[in-house]
Amino acid sequence: MPQLQEAGELTGTKDKDYNIIWFTEQCLSNVLRLETYAADAEREGDTELAEFFRRAQETSRKGADQGKELLGSRLAG
């Protein structure tokens, strides 16, 4: 079966817009997942690992914020 190339015809969402939505959702999911990982590390007394996950969580949060901002400006325009 040939691979279908979706460019927005089926979903009504252009790839570039879908990609922003996907990226933002993944960043938000990472923020939640990393909260669990940091809590696990803290429960085990591993402060270094907990801090590592908190830094990664902040990076994901920034990515989500940037994605939301970009998506918002594109939807408004």
Question: Model segments located where?
Answer:
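Iron-associated oxidoreductase/ferritin-like identity signal
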Residues: 1-77
